[in-house]
Amino acid sequence: MAPLTPQLLLQRGRPKTDKLGKIQSLNLSGLQLLSEHLDPNLLGRLKKLRELDLSNNLLETLPANLGLSHLRILRCTNNQLGDVTALHQFPELEELNLEGNPFLTVSDNLKVSFLLPKLRKVNGKDTASTCSQVENLDRELMDRVTAHWQKFIATVSPEEETDKVRADFMRSAVRDVCYGPESLIEFTQWRVRMIAEELVASGGAQVQDAKVPVEHPQAAGASKFRAREVASKRPGKDPVTLPPSKRVRALPPAQAEGSPMGADGGQAALHLEPLHFLQCHSRNNSPKDLETQLWACAFEPAREEGHSRATSQTVATCGGEAVCVIDCQTGLVLHKYKVPGEEFFSVAWTALTVVTQAGHKKRWNMLAAAGLRGMVRLLHVRAGFCCSVIRAHKKAIATLCFSPSHETHLFTASYDKRIILWDIGVPNQDYKFQASQLLTLNCGSVPLRLCPVATCPDDFLLAGCEGGCYCWDVRLDQPQKQRVCEVNFIFSEDSKVSGQRVDGLAFVNEDVVASKGSGQGTIYLWSWSQTWAGRGRQSVLPVVILVRLQWSPTNLAYFSLSTCPGKNLVLCGDEEGSVWIYDVEHLLKEPPQATTLQPPTQILKWPQPTALGQPVTKTMINTVVANAAFTYLTALTDSNIVSIWRRC
């Protein structure tokens, strides 16, 4: 492609004119333009240009000083942009579209909101929520950099050279001032460097935050398959908050009667405090929505093995027509993906190794989300777009999970009473996936929970179903591509009990499985190896129960349990808004009599946050998940509230 010419600009510009200075709208899309083709001397003659379309080109960056100071609308979709800082040259910009630039991340979205104070829309979406996030994040970073400066300058000797002091402070600030999620570290380090430079230039005077837009209002943020009767809520006007007395101090750990606690051989309490209550799945962004049921959440895997911040504090949540990705420390909603008319039931993470067009290997954390429509949506969260949609089932998908041993292998379980194993592959040059179907597992009832066997995930898959707990052979070296279950696990010799729903299923460690149903008031801990060793040729197999844990006797279903394997913890919510926590390490070392119900180590009571000016006095906790280090715990309710707790 030859460089741009005045004739080409006149041909593609509007209104039609013979003078470059009169063009107000210019379409340069689809011309295979490279960054060096954007000549500032030529484009700078477009003195009245208000709208520019650079979509579907090969731009890696935008040249500085293009001279388009009056530009209001800029479209740069489907390019190769890797940096957005050059956009600051367009101070009047109101609308920006950067979709289809795979190297841009959530950090770049925040940079854009910071650099362009008049921006109203990015990628077709209102920027109010992002601007509010930038405000809060920037305010905290300013406070931390200022505190770091004061601490640093107190240790400096008067004899030290000024230039060396400044350089040392800059390095230490970028290295030591940390806040927010790892996914935003590029933005936070960028802002820390800017704030530090301003501090040094001002001799330590308080940095002003006039650059941050402060007047944008913050955006507020029932399935036929799973709907339960909605718990009572009370309307009002304000966002979800805790009463002041519960926000300023750690909530004392609630202890179930008879819990093993204290120094007399019992277990010490796990101290957790309520940190954030978020209403980010609202339909139509309505703050009055206390009805949307939230179903599943999963913590993002660490971005880099051996990284100093190896434990993720980023959690994906789903419910209603939205999937949200939230930073637990700050409570910021980093990304929100909405599909009108969808009901999301499940999310799952995987980490893929992707080769870029330049031949570089990158590690991508991909999020799969699925629900009512039977489609799996693969989201590249850091870049903020949906890569592909897999039309997996004709009926709703109840749950999904990735294989722990094959990063591209995905199990989907549907209300069509089938489980399908997919190989999603890796994205091509257009960042699209080509999924292939590997296995179909037939179920006698609807599968609700999936759990690859910890010691042999390539061989066997467990599933909790409406009709019980089942196991399938999933070895890919076997010829059959359609398979029936190998074993039906039962928890009692009573056939009535054996056919009951299993809606909670997870491995506590490599051998011990936790499972539960409704109406039993019990969570079972049972041994996979001991149970499987007694199989023989049986198709119905009693499990070897190690421990029975006391839980709510409710007849309501779909309260999912989870585990924190490295900590030997089992977690489950209930119909009263409580979180039941079981530290089972001592129980597994010295199992009690199997018939004895063991009480929870701790119960976190619902703290009754305020929504719309009135307390939410009652809710149900559908799902509870903690990160690997058990520093954060996320509980999802049936009243459109994501509650985040922090271990203290």
From Swiss-Prot:
Which segments show compositional bias classed as Basic and acidic residues?
A: 226-237
GO MF, one term, reads: chromatin binding
Q: Where are the LRR repeats?
A: 22-43, 48-69, 70-91, 92-113
Arranged from A to Z, the UniProt key words for this protein are: Centromere, Chromatin regulator, Chromosome, Cytoplasm, Cytoskeleton, DNA replication, Kinetochore, Leucine-rich repeat, Nucleus, Phosphoprotein, Repeat, Telomere, Ubl conjugation, WD repeat
Source superkingdom: Eukaryota
Which residues does this entry mark as bearing Phosphoserine?
S259
Q: Which GO terms describe its cellular component?
A: centrosome; chromosome, telomeric region; cytoplasm; kinetochore; nuclear origin of replication recognition complex; nucleolus; nucleoplasm; nucleus
Broad class of the protein's primary localization? nucleus
Q: Where are the WD repeats?
A: 392-432, 443-482, 497-536, 541-592, 616-648
Q: What is known of its domains?
A: The entire WD repeat region is required for the interaction with ORC, CDT1 and GMNN, as well as for association with chromatin and for binding to histone H3 and H4 trimethylation marks H3K9me3 and H4K20me3. Centrosomal localization requires additional conformation.
- What is said about its interaction partners and assembly? Integral component of the ORC complex. Directly interacts with CDT1, GMNN and ORC2. Interacts with ORC2 only when non-ubiquitinated; this interaction prevents LRWD1 ubiquitination and degradation. Some of these interactions are regulated in a cell-cycle dependent manner. Interaction with ORC1 occurs predominantly during G1. Association with phosphorylated ORC1 during mitosis is not efficient. Interaction with CDT1 occurs during G1 phase, as well as during mitosis with phosphorylated CDT1. Interaction with GMNN occurs from G1/S to mitosis.
Q: What is this protein called?
A: Leucine-rich repeat and WD repeat-containing protein 1
Q: Which gene encodes it?
A: LRWD1
